[in-house]
Amino acid sequence: MKVKTKLLGIISILVVSIIGIGGSSVFMISSTVKKNEELKDKMEFQKEIKHIQYELTGLSNDERGFLITRDKEYDEGMKGKADDVLKSLDRVNDLIDEEKYQSNIEDIKTSFTQYRALNQQVVTAYSSNPKKAETIHFGEERTIRKEGVAPAVNKLSDRLDQEVEDLKDEIQGNGKMSQSLIIIVTGISVILGIVLSIMLLKSIMVPLRSINKQLEEIAHGEADLTKKVIVKNKDEFGQLAQSFNSFTHSLTQIVKQISSSSEQVAASSEELSASAEESKSTSEHISRAMQMAADSNVKQSSMTEKSAESITELLDSISSVASNTGNIADLSSSMRDKAEIGSKSVNKMLDQMKFIDKSVDSAGNGLQTLVASTAEISDISSLITTISEQTNLLALNAAIEAARAGEQGKGFAVVAEEVRKLADETNKSANHIQSVVATIQNESIETVNNIKVVQENVSSGIVLSQETTGNFNEILNLVEQVTSQIQEVAAATQQLTSGVEVIQHTVHTLAAGTKETSANTEAVANSSQEQLHSMGEISYAAESLSQLAEELQTVINRFKY
Protein backbone atom coordinates (compact mmCIF):
# COMPACT_ATOMS: atom_id res chain seq x y z
CA MET A 1 0.00 0.00 0.00
CA LYS A 2 1.34 3.45 -0.94
CA VAL A 3 2.23 5.95 1.77
CA LYS A 4 -0.24 8.41 0.24
CA THR A 5 -3.02 5.80 0.45
CA LYS A 6 -2.21 5.11 4.12
CA LEU A 7 -2.34 8.81 4.93
CA LEU A 8 -5.65 9.31 3.13
CA GLY A 9 -7.11 6.28 4.92
CA ILE A 10 -6.10 7.52 8.37
CA ILE A 11 -7.35 11.04 7.68
CA SER A 12 -10.66 9.69 6.33
CA ILE A 13 -11.22 7.56 9.45
CA LEU A 14 -10.47 10.48 11.76
CA VAL A 15 -12.67 12.89 9.78
CA VAL A 16 -15.60 10.43 9.83
CA SER A 17 -15.16 9.96 13.59
CA ILE A 18 -15.06 13.71 14.20
CA ILE A 19 -18.14 14.31 12.03
CA GLY A 20 -19.94 11.55 13.94
CA ILE A 21 -19.12 13.18 17.28
CA GLY A 22 -20.26 16.60 16.09
CA GLY A 23 -23.46 15.28 14.51
CA SER A 24 -24.46 13.24 17.55
CA SER A 25 -23.72 16.19 19.86
CA VAL A 26 -25.85 18.58 17.78
CA PHE A 27 -28.68 16.04 17.59
CA MET A 28 -28.66 15.39 21.35
CA ILE A 29 -28.53 19.07 22.23
CA SER A 30 -31.34 19.93 19.77
CA SER A 31 -33.50 17.18 21.26
CA THR A 32 -32.79 18.42 24.81
CA VAL A 33 -33.61 22.03 23.90
CA LYS A 34 -36.87 20.93 22.28
CA LYS A 35 -37.87 18.93 25.37
CA ASN A 36 -37.04 21.86 27.63
CA GLU A 37 -39.21 24.18 25.53
CA GLU A 38 -42.03 21.67 25.88
CA LEU A 39 -41.40 21.50 29.66
CA LYS A 40 -41.43 25.29 29.89
CA ASP A 41 -44.81 25.51 28.09
CA LYS A 42 -46.37 22.84 30.28
CA MET A 43 -45.09 24.46 33.46
CA GLU A 44 -46.58 27.76 32.28
CA PHE A 45 -49.83 25.87 31.65
CA GLN A 46 -49.50 24.36 35.13
CA LYS A 47 -48.95 27.83 36.60
CA GLU A 48 -52.20 29.13 35.03
CA ILE A 49 -54.18 26.14 36.36
CA LYS A 50 -52.78 26.73 39.85
CA HIS A 51 -53.76 30.37 39.50
CA ILE A 52 -57.31 29.34 38.56
CA GLN A 53 -57.47 27.14 41.67
CA TYR A 54 -56.28 30.05 43.77
CA GLU A 55 -58.83 32.47 42.25
CA LEU A 56 -61.68 29.98 42.65
CA THR A 57 -60.82 29.59 46.32
CA GLY A 58 -60.65 33.37 46.70
CA LEU A 59 -63.99 33.76 44.89
CA SER A 60 -65.66 31.34 47.30
CA ASN A 61 -64.09 33.10 50.29
CA ASP A 62 -65.22 36.52 49.03
CA GLU A 63 -68.77 35.21 48.63
CA ARG A 64 -68.82 33.95 52.22
CA GLY A 65 -67.35 37.24 53.38
CA PHE A 66 -70.07 39.08 51.49
CA LEU A 67 -72.78 36.95 53.10
CA ILE A 68 -71.32 37.58 56.54
CA THR A 69 -70.40 41.27 56.33
CA ARG A 70 -72.44 42.59 53.34
CA ASP A 71 -69.32 44.53 52.34
CA LYS A 72 -69.39 45.70 48.70
CA GLU A 73 -65.62 45.22 48.46
CA TYR A 74 -66.19 41.46 48.47
CA ASP A 75 -68.54 41.88 45.52
CA GLU A 76 -65.87 43.79 43.62
CA GLY A 77 -63.32 41.13 44.60
CA MET A 78 -65.57 38.37 43.24
CA LYS A 79 -65.92 40.20 39.92
CA GLY A 80 -62.15 40.70 39.67
CA LYS A 81 -61.40 37.07 40.49
CA ALA A 82 -63.99 35.82 38.01
CA ASP A 83 -62.44 37.99 35.30
CA ASP A 84 -58.98 36.64 36.23
CA VAL A 85 -60.26 33.07 35.88
CA LEU A 86 -61.66 33.80 32.42
CA LYS A 87 -58.42 35.51 31.36
CA SER A 88 -56.38 32.55 32.62
CA LEU A 89 -58.57 30.18 30.61
CA ASP A 90 -57.97 32.31 27.51
CA ARG A 91 -54.19 32.27 28.14
CA VAL A 92 -54.34 28.49 28.54
CA ASN A 93 -55.93 28.19 25.09
CA ASP A 94 -53.08 30.27 23.64
CA LEU A 95 -50.38 28.23 25.42
CA ILE A 96 -51.58 24.71 24.61
CA ASP A 97 -52.64 23.65 21.12
CA GLU A 98 -52.94 19.95 21.91
CA GLU A 99 -56.48 18.56 21.48
CA LYS A 100 -56.15 16.23 24.48
CA TYR A 101 -56.54 19.20 26.85
CA GLN A 102 -59.49 20.84 25.07
CA SER A 103 -62.13 18.67 26.75
CA ASN A 104 -60.72 19.48 30.21
CA ILE A 105 -60.68 23.20 29.44
CA GLU A 106 -64.25 23.09 28.13
CA ASP A 107 -65.41 21.25 31.27
CA ILE A 108 -63.80 23.92 33.44
CA LYS A 109 -65.37 26.73 31.39
CA THR A 110 -68.85 25.15 31.51
CA SER A 111 -68.70 24.46 35.25
CA PHE A 112 -67.31 27.90 35.99
CA THR A 113 -70.01 29.59 33.89
CA GLN A 114 -72.68 27.80 35.93
CA TYR A 115 -70.88 28.58 39.15
CA ARG A 116 -70.51 32.25 38.22
CA ALA A 117 -74.22 32.50 37.35
CA LEU A 118 -75.19 31.10 40.75
CA ASN A 119 -72.69 33.42 42.38
CA GLN A 120 -74.36 36.41 40.79
CA GLN A 121 -77.77 35.08 41.90
CA VAL A 122 -76.49 34.92 45.46
CA VAL A 123 -75.32 38.54 45.30
CA THR A 124 -78.61 39.69 43.73
CA ALA A 125 -80.86 37.73 46.10
CA TYR A 126 -78.99 38.71 49.24
CA SER A 127 -80.29 42.27 49.27
CA SER A 128 -83.95 41.15 49.22
CA ASN A 129 -83.84 37.62 50.67
CA PRO A 130 -80.64 36.74 52.59
CA LYS A 131 -82.01 33.33 53.50
CA LYS A 132 -82.45 32.39 49.86
CA ALA A 133 -78.96 33.64 49.09
CA GLU A 134 -77.49 31.44 51.82
CA THR A 135 -79.53 28.48 50.56
CA ILE A 136 -78.14 28.92 47.04
CA HIS A 137 -74.61 29.40 48.38
CA PHE A 138 -74.56 26.33 50.62
CA GLY A 139 -76.71 24.24 48.33
CA GLU A 140 -76.65 24.31 44.55
CA GLU A 141 -73.63 26.59 44.22
CA ARG A 142 -71.56 24.50 46.65
CA THR A 143 -72.54 21.34 44.76
CA ILE A 144 -71.36 22.79 41.43
CA ARG A 145 -68.10 23.97 43.00
CA LYS A 146 -67.40 20.65 44.75
CA GLU A 147 -68.62 18.33 41.98
CA GLY A 148 -68.02 20.40 38.86
CA VAL A 149 -65.46 23.18 38.93
CA ALA A 150 -63.02 21.89 41.57
CA PRO A 151 -62.80 18.28 40.24
CA ALA A 152 -62.30 19.50 36.67
CA VAL A 153 -59.51 21.87 37.71
CA ASN A 154 -57.91 19.31 40.04
CA LYS A 155 -58.04 16.60 37.37
CA LEU A 156 -56.27 18.80 34.85
CA SER A 157 -53.77 19.94 37.51
CA ASP A 158 -52.92 16.35 38.49
CA ARG A 159 -52.54 15.40 34.85
CA LEU A 160 -50.17 18.29 34.23
CA ASP A 161 -48.15 17.45 37.36
CA GLN A 162 -47.64 13.89 36.14
CA GLU A 163 -46.71 14.96 32.60
CA VAL A 164 -44.23 17.54 33.92
CA GLU A 165 -42.56 14.91 36.11
CA ASP A 166 -42.39 12.43 33.19
CA LEU A 167 -40.90 15.08 30.92
CA LYS A 168 -38.27 15.98 33.52
CA ASP A 169 -37.30 12.31 33.88
CA GLU A 170 -37.03 11.98 30.09
CA ILE A 171 -34.79 15.09 29.84
CA GLN A 172 -32.54 13.79 32.60
CA GLY A 173 -32.28 10.36 30.95
CA ASN A 174 -31.45 11.88 27.55
CA GLY A 175 -28.74 14.04 29.14
CA LYS A 176 -27.03 11.04 30.74
CA MET A 177 -27.26 9.00 27.54
CA SER A 178 -25.80 11.80 25.38
CA GLN A 179 -22.97 12.30 27.88
CA SER A 180 -22.05 8.60 27.83
CA LEU A 181 -22.29 8.41 24.02
CA ILE A 182 -20.04 11.44 23.48
CA ILE A 183 -17.41 10.14 25.94
CA ILE A 184 -17.37 6.67 24.33
CA VAL A 185 -17.17 7.93 20.72
CA THR A 186 -14.48 10.49 21.61
CA GLY A 187 -12.37 7.89 23.42
CA ILE A 188 -12.58 5.43 20.53
CA SER A 189 -11.65 8.16 18.00
CA VAL A 190 -8.61 9.28 20.02
CA ILE A 191 -7.33 5.72 20.52
CA LEU A 192 -7.89 4.88 16.84
CA GLY A 193 -6.05 8.03 15.71
CA ILE A 194 -3.05 7.28 17.97
CA VAL A 195 -2.79 3.64 16.85
CA LEU A 196 -3.04 4.48 13.14
CA SER A 197 -0.49 7.32 13.45
CA ILE A 198 2.01 5.03 15.22
CA MET A 199 1.56 2.37 12.53
CA LEU A 200 2.10 4.93 9.77
CA LEU A 201 5.23 6.38 11.39
CA LYS A 202 6.64 2.89 11.93
CA SER A 203 6.07 1.93 8.28
CA ILE A 204 7.94 5.10 7.21
CA MET A 205 10.80 5.32 9.74
CA VAL A 206 11.98 1.65 9.75
CA PRO A 207 12.84 1.39 6.02
CA LEU A 208 14.13 4.97 5.92
CA ARG A 209 16.56 4.35 8.80
CA SER A 210 17.80 1.14 7.16
CA ILE A 211 18.52 2.94 3.88
CA ASN A 212 20.13 5.89 5.65
CA LYS A 213 22.40 3.59 7.69
CA GLN A 214 23.62 1.82 4.54
CA LEU A 215 24.37 5.10 2.79
CA GLU A 216 26.31 6.38 5.82
CA GLU A 217 28.42 3.21 5.85
CA ILE A 218 29.24 3.64 2.17
CA ALA A 219 30.01 7.36 2.47
CA HIS A 220 31.92 7.50 5.78
CA GLY A 221 32.34 4.04 7.25
CA GLU A 222 33.16 0.53 6.05
CA ALA A 223 31.72 1.01 2.54
CA ASP A 224 30.39 -2.55 2.59
CA LEU A 225 28.74 -3.11 -0.79
CA THR A 226 27.77 -6.71 0.05
CA LYS A 227 25.01 -5.65 2.42
CA LYS A 228 21.46 -5.50 1.13
CA VAL A 229 18.64 -3.29 2.35
CA ILE A 230 15.69 -5.54 3.23
CA VAL A 231 12.34 -3.72 3.15
CA LYS A 232 9.19 -5.85 2.91
CA ASN A 233 6.92 -2.87 2.26
CA LYS A 234 5.32 -2.62 -1.17
CA ASP A 235 5.24 1.16 -1.11
CA GLU A 236 7.68 3.87 -2.23
CA PHE A 237 10.23 2.78 0.38
CA GLY A 238 10.15 -0.79 -0.94
CA GLN A 239 10.83 0.53 -4.45
CA LEU A 240 13.60 2.75 -3.10
CA ALA A 241 15.21 -0.24 -1.34
CA GLN A 242 15.13 -2.29 -4.55
CA SER A 243 16.67 0.57 -6.52
CA PHE A 244 19.35 1.02 -3.86
CA ASN A 245 20.22 -2.70 -3.92
CA SER A 246 20.51 -2.54 -7.72
CA PHE A 247 22.77 0.49 -7.37
CA THR A 248 25.08 -1.28 -4.88
CA HIS A 249 25.24 -4.32 -7.17
CA SER A 250 26.24 -2.17 -10.15
CA LEU A 251 28.72 -0.27 -8.00
CA THR A 252 30.25 -3.58 -6.84
CA GLN A 253 30.85 -4.66 -10.44
CA ILE A 254 32.40 -1.30 -11.27
CA VAL A 255 34.72 -1.42 -8.24
CA LYS A 256 35.82 -4.95 -9.13
CA GLN A 257 36.62 -3.87 -12.67
CA ILE A 258 38.50 -0.78 -11.45
CA SER A 259 40.48 -2.94 -8.99
CA SER A 260 41.49 -5.36 -11.71
CA SER A 261 42.50 -2.54 -14.04
CA SER A 262 44.51 -0.78 -11.33
CA GLU A 263 46.43 -3.98 -10.61
CA GLN A 264 47.27 -4.27 -14.30
CA VAL A 265 48.37 -0.64 -14.35
CA ALA A 266 50.60 -1.20 -11.31
CA ALA A 267 52.17 -4.28 -12.86
CA SER A 268 52.71 -2.48 -16.15
CA SER A 269 54.28 0.51 -14.42
CA GLU A 270 56.67 -1.74 -12.51
CA GLU A 271 57.69 -3.50 -15.69
CA LEU A 272 58.10 -0.15 -17.42
CA SER A 273 60.31 1.12 -14.59
CA ALA A 274 62.43 -2.03 -14.73
CA SER A 275 62.82 -1.69 -18.47
CA ALA A 276 63.85 1.95 -18.14
CA GLU A 277 66.53 1.09 -15.57
CA GLU A 278 67.78 -1.70 -17.71
CA SER A 279 67.95 0.58 -20.74
CA LYS A 280 69.81 3.18 -18.73
CA SER A 281 72.37 0.73 -17.35
CA THR A 282 73.08 -0.67 -20.77
CA SER A 283 73.15 2.61 -22.64
CA GLU A 284 76.93 2.39 -22.83
CA HIS A 285 76.56 -0.93 -24.60
CA ILE A 286 73.76 0.29 -26.84
CA SER A 287 75.55 -0.56 -30.01
CA ARG A 288 75.99 -4.17 -29.01
CA ALA A 289 72.48 -4.57 -27.56
CA MET A 290 70.56 -2.62 -30.19
CA GLN A 291 68.35 -5.52 -31.07
CA MET A 292 67.59 -6.19 -27.41
CA ALA A 293 66.61 -2.54 -26.90
CA ALA A 294 64.37 -2.70 -29.96
CA ASP A 295 62.60 -5.78 -28.60
CA SER A 296 62.16 -4.12 -25.23
CA ASN A 297 60.71 -1.02 -26.88
CA VAL A 298 58.23 -3.12 -28.84
CA LYS A 299 57.14 -4.92 -25.67
CA GLN A 300 56.92 -1.62 -23.80
CA SER A 301 54.76 -0.10 -26.54
CA SER A 302 52.37 -3.08 -26.45
CA MET A 303 52.00 -2.91 -22.67
CA THR A 304 51.45 0.84 -22.80
CA GLU A 305 48.65 0.41 -25.33
CA LYS A 306 47.03 -2.22 -23.11
CA SER A 307 47.29 0.12 -20.14
CA ALA A 308 45.66 2.89 -22.17
CA GLU A 309 42.80 0.57 -23.12
CA SER A 310 42.32 -0.52 -19.48
CA ILE A 311 42.30 3.05 -18.28
CA THR A 312 39.74 3.96 -20.95
CA GLU A 313 37.49 1.15 -19.70
CA LEU A 314 38.03 2.35 -16.14
CA LEU A 315 36.99 5.89 -17.13
CA ASP A 316 33.80 4.56 -18.77
CA SER A 317 32.94 2.58 -15.61
CA ILE A 318 33.43 5.62 -13.40
CA SER A 319 31.15 7.65 -15.70
CA SER A 320 28.50 4.97 -15.25
CA VAL A 321 28.88 5.27 -11.47
CA ALA A 322 28.38 9.04 -11.72
CA SER A 323 25.23 8.52 -13.82
CA ASN A 324 23.77 6.03 -11.29
CA THR A 325 24.56 8.43 -8.47
CA GLY A 326 22.54 11.12 -10.26
CA ASN A 327 19.61 8.71 -10.54
CA ILE A 328 19.74 8.06 -6.80
CA ALA A 329 19.68 11.82 -6.17
CA ASP A 330 16.52 12.05 -8.31
CA LEU A 331 14.91 9.24 -6.29
CA SER A 332 15.75 11.09 -3.06
CA SER A 333 14.06 14.23 -4.41
CA SER A 334 10.97 12.19 -5.28
CA MET A 335 10.91 10.73 -1.76
CA ARG A 336 11.11 14.26 -0.33
CA ASP A 337 8.11 15.33 -2.47
CA LYS A 338 6.07 12.38 -1.13
CA ALA A 339 6.92 13.35 2.45
CA GLU A 340 5.82 16.95 1.76
CA ILE A 341 2.45 15.66 0.47
CA GLY A 342 2.07 13.66 3.70
CA SER A 343 2.81 16.78 5.76
CA LYS A 344 0.12 18.75 3.89
CA SER A 345 -2.42 15.95 4.53
CA VAL A 346 -1.69 16.05 8.27
CA ASN A 347 -2.16 19.84 8.22
CA LYS A 348 -5.56 19.30 6.58
CA MET A 349 -6.48 16.86 9.39
CA LEU A 350 -5.42 19.55 11.91
CA ASP A 351 -7.86 22.03 10.27
CA GLN A 352 -10.70 19.45 10.62
CA MET A 353 -9.88 19.02 14.33
CA LYS A 354 -10.12 22.77 14.80
CA PHE A 355 -13.54 22.78 13.05
CA ILE A 356 -14.80 20.14 15.51
CA ASP A 357 -13.47 22.26 18.37
CA LYS A 358 -15.74 25.11 17.16
CA SER A 359 -18.75 22.71 16.96
CA VAL A 360 -18.21 21.62 20.57
CA ASP A 361 -18.09 25.32 21.59
CA SER A 362 -21.50 25.78 19.91
CA ALA A 363 -22.88 22.81 21.87
CA GLY A 364 -21.62 24.38 25.10
CA ASN A 365 -23.46 27.62 24.26
CA GLY A 366 -26.68 25.63 23.77
CA LEU A 367 -26.33 24.13 27.23
CA GLN A 368 -25.75 27.61 28.68
CA THR A 369 -29.14 28.58 27.18
CA LEU A 370 -30.65 25.50 28.88
CA VAL A 371 -29.24 26.64 32.25
CA ALA A 372 -30.83 30.08 31.70
CA SER A 373 -34.21 28.44 30.96
CA THR A 374 -34.06 26.42 34.19
CA ALA A 375 -33.35 29.65 36.07
CA GLU A 376 -36.54 31.12 34.57
CA ILE A 377 -38.48 28.01 35.70
CA SER A 378 -37.05 28.49 39.19
CA ASP A 379 -38.37 32.07 39.20
CA ILE A 380 -41.83 30.80 38.24
CA SER A 381 -41.82 28.27 41.11
CA SER A 382 -40.76 31.06 43.47
CA LEU A 383 -43.80 33.05 42.30
CA ILE A 384 -46.03 30.05 43.07
CA THR A 385 -44.48 29.86 46.56
CA THR A 386 -45.24 33.56 47.11
CA ILE A 387 -48.84 33.09 46.00
CA SER A 388 -49.27 30.10 48.35
CA GLU A 389 -47.89 32.14 51.24
CA GLN A 390 -50.38 34.93 50.46
CA THR A 391 -53.18 32.36 50.29
CA ASN A 392 -52.12 30.99 53.67
CA LEU A 393 -52.25 34.54 55.05
CA LEU A 394 -55.74 35.04 53.61
CA ALA A 395 -56.84 31.75 55.16
CA LEU A 396 -55.53 32.94 58.52
CA ASN A 397 -57.46 36.19 58.17
CA ALA A 398 -60.57 34.25 57.22
CA ALA A 399 -60.19 32.03 60.31
CA ILE A 400 -59.91 35.15 62.47
CA GLU A 401 -63.05 36.61 60.90
CA ALA A 402 -64.83 33.28 61.42
CA ALA A 403 -63.85 33.31 65.08
CA ARG A 404 -65.28 36.79 65.43
CA ALA A 405 -68.53 35.68 63.80
CA GLY A 406 -69.01 33.02 66.45
CA GLU A 407 -71.43 30.20 65.68
CA GLN A 408 -72.27 31.58 62.26
CA GLY A 409 -68.59 31.55 61.23
CA LYS A 410 -67.89 27.87 61.99
CA GLY A 411 -68.49 26.81 58.42
CA PHE A 412 -66.33 29.68 57.23
CA ALA A 413 -63.57 28.52 59.63
CA VAL A 414 -63.68 25.03 58.14
CA VAL A 415 -63.30 26.51 54.67
CA ALA A 416 -60.42 28.70 55.87
CA GLU A 417 -58.66 25.61 57.25
CA GLU A 418 -59.10 23.84 53.90
CA VAL A 419 -57.69 26.88 52.12
CA ARG A 420 -54.70 26.90 54.47
CA LYS A 421 -54.07 23.20 53.80
CA LEU A 422 -54.34 23.81 50.06
CA ALA A 423 -51.84 26.69 50.36
CA ASP A 424 -49.44 24.44 52.29
CA GLU A 425 -49.70 21.74 49.61
CA THR A 426 -49.12 24.36 46.92
CA ASN A 427 -46.06 25.61 48.81
CA LYS A 428 -44.70 22.05 49.07
CA SER A 429 -45.27 21.50 45.34
CA ALA A 430 -43.48 24.74 44.51
CA ASN A 431 -40.55 23.74 46.73
CA HIS A 432 -40.46 20.36 45.00
CA ILE A 433 -40.38 22.12 41.61
CA GLN A 434 -37.47 24.28 42.81
CA SER A 435 -35.64 21.12 43.93
CA VAL A 436 -36.18 19.48 40.53
CA VAL A 437 -35.08 22.67 38.73
CA ALA A 438 -31.93 22.76 40.89
CA THR A 439 -31.24 19.14 39.91
CA ILE A 440 -31.63 20.04 36.21
CA GLN A 441 -29.29 23.00 36.67
CA ASN A 442 -26.67 20.78 38.33
CA GLU A 443 -26.99 18.17 35.56
CA SER A 444 -26.70 20.93 32.93
CA ILE A 445 -23.58 22.30 34.62
CA GLU A 446 -22.12 18.77 34.73
CA THR A 447 -22.90 18.38 31.01
CA VAL A 448 -21.14 21.71 30.35
CA ASN A 449 -18.11 20.36 32.24
CA ASN A 450 -18.22 17.17 30.16
CA ILE A 451 -18.27 19.26 26.98
CA LYS A 452 -15.19 21.02 28.33
CA VAL A 453 -13.59 17.56 28.69
CA VAL A 454 -14.49 16.90 25.03
CA GLN A 455 -12.88 20.24 24.13
CA GLU A 456 -9.73 19.20 26.00
CA ASN A 457 -9.70 15.86 24.11
CA VAL A 458 -10.09 17.69 20.79
CA SER A 459 -7.23 20.01 21.86
CA SER A 460 -5.13 16.89 22.58
CA GLY A 461 -5.99 15.65 19.07
CA ILE A 462 -4.80 18.99 17.68
CA VAL A 463 -1.52 18.72 19.64
CA LEU A 464 -1.07 15.13 18.38
CA SER A 465 -1.62 16.31 14.78
CA GLN A 466 0.97 19.06 15.33
CA GLU A 467 3.44 16.45 16.64
CA THR A 468 2.77 14.35 13.54
CA THR A 469 3.55 17.40 11.40
CA GLY A 470 6.84 17.73 13.31
CA ASN A 471 7.64 14.09 12.59
CA PHE A 472 7.07 14.69 8.88
CA ASN A 473 9.41 17.65 9.05
CA GLU A 474 12.01 15.38 10.66
CA ILE A 475 11.52 12.92 7.79
CA LEU A 476 12.10 15.75 5.30
CA ASN A 477 15.33 16.67 7.15
CA LEU A 478 16.52 13.05 6.99
CA VAL A 479 15.78 12.93 3.26
CA GLU A 480 17.76 16.15 2.82
CA GLN A 481 20.68 14.50 4.64
CA VAL A 482 20.46 11.47 2.35
CA THR A 483 20.48 13.76 -0.69
CA SER A 484 23.53 15.59 0.67
CA GLN A 485 25.39 12.31 1.21
CA ILE A 486 24.57 11.17 -2.32
CA GLN A 487 25.95 14.44 -3.64
CA GLU A 488 29.17 13.80 -1.70
CA VAL A 489 29.43 10.38 -3.37
CA ALA A 490 28.93 12.08 -6.75
CA ALA A 491 31.72 14.57 -5.92
CA ALA A 492 34.07 11.75 -4.92
CA THR A 493 33.27 9.98 -8.18
CA GLN A 494 34.09 13.17 -10.10
CA GLN A 495 37.48 13.40 -8.34
CA LEU A 496 38.16 9.77 -9.22
CA THR A 497 37.32 10.52 -12.86
CA SER A 498 39.78 13.41 -12.89
CA GLY A 499 42.55 11.17 -11.49
CA VAL A 500 41.94 8.50 -14.10
CA GLU A 501 42.01 11.12 -16.86
CA VAL A 502 45.46 12.20 -15.62
CA ILE A 503 46.61 8.56 -15.73
CA GLN A 504 45.17 8.18 -19.23
CA HIS A 505 47.00 11.28 -20.40
CA THR A 506 50.26 10.02 -18.88
CA VAL A 507 49.93 6.59 -20.48
CA HIS A 508 49.23 8.12 -23.88
CA THR A 509 52.29 10.31 -23.46
CA LEU A 510 54.32 7.25 -22.50
CA ALA A 511 53.02 5.36 -25.54
CA ALA A 512 54.00 8.22 -27.80
CA GLY A 513 57.49 8.33 -26.28
CA THR A 514 57.87 4.57 -26.64
CA LYS A 515 56.95 4.71 -30.33
CA GLU A 516 59.38 7.52 -30.87
CA THR A 517 62.13 5.53 -29.11
CA SER A 518 61.38 2.50 -31.26
CA ALA A 519 61.54 4.62 -34.42
CA ASN A 520 64.89 6.08 -33.50
CA THR A 521 66.52 2.83 -32.42
CA GLU A 522 68.99 2.91 -35.36
CA ALA A 523 70.27 6.31 -34.25
CA VAL A 524 70.77 5.35 -30.61
CA ALA A 525 74.46 4.73 -31.04
CA ASN A 526 75.02 8.27 -32.23
CA SER A 527 72.81 9.85 -29.54
CA SER A 528 73.48 7.81 -26.38
CA GLN A 529 73.34 10.93 -24.20
CA GLU A 530 69.93 11.80 -25.54
CA GLN A 531 68.80 8.24 -24.91
CA LEU A 532 70.02 8.42 -21.28
CA HIS A 533 67.99 11.61 -20.83
CA SER A 534 64.94 9.96 -22.40
CA MET A 535 65.35 6.95 -20.09
CA GLY A 536 65.28 9.33 -17.10
CA GLU A 537 61.98 10.77 -18.28
CA ILE A 538 60.58 7.29 -18.83
CA SER A 539 61.66 6.25 -15.33
CA TYR A 540 59.96 9.32 -13.83
CA ALA A 541 56.75 8.64 -15.79
CA ALA A 542 56.77 5.02 -14.64
CA GLU A 543 57.10 6.10 -11.02
CA SER A 544 54.20 8.56 -11.43
CA LEU A 545 52.09 5.85 -13.03
CA SER A 546 52.89 3.45 -10.20
CA GLN A 547 52.01 6.09 -7.59
CA LEU A 548 48.69 6.84 -9.30
CA ALA A 549 47.91 3.11 -9.45
CA GLU A 550 48.60 2.81 -5.71
CA GLU A 551 46.33 5.78 -4.95
CA LEU A 552 43.59 4.25 -7.08
CA GLN A 553 43.99 0.93 -5.28
CA THR A 554 43.74 2.71 -1.90
CA VAL A 555 40.44 4.31 -2.94
CA ILE A 556 39.10 0.97 -4.15
CA ASN A 557 40.10 -0.80 -0.93
CA ARG A 558 37.64 1.40 0.97
CA PHE A 559 34.86 -0.68 -0.59
CA LYS A 560 33.99 -4.18 0.57
CA TYR A 561 32.80 -6.26 -2.39
From Swiss-Prot:
Keywords: Cell membrane, Membrane, Methylation, Transducer, Transmembrane, Transmembrane helix. Residues 269-302 are annotated as: Disordered. It is found in: Cell membrane. InterPro entries: CHASE3, Chemotax_Me-accpt_rcpt, HAMP_dom, MCPsignal_dom. It is a multi-pass membrane protein. It comes from the Bacteria. The modification Glutamate methyl ester (Glu) is found at residues 271, 530, 537. The chain crosses the membrane at residues 7-27, 181-201. Residues 277-287 have a biased composition (Basic and acidic residues). PROSITE patterns: CHEMOTAXIS_TRANSDUC_2, HAMP. Residues 202-256 form the HAMP domain. The keyword Cytoplasm does not apply. GO terms for biological process: chemotaxis; signal transduction. One of its GO terms (cellular component) is plasma membrane. Residues 275-511 form the Methyl-accepting transducer domain. Belongs to the methyl-accepting chemotaxis (MCP) protein family. This is Putative methyl-accepting chemotaxis protein YoaH. The lineage of its organism: Bacteria, Bacillati, Bacillota, Bacilli, Bacillales.
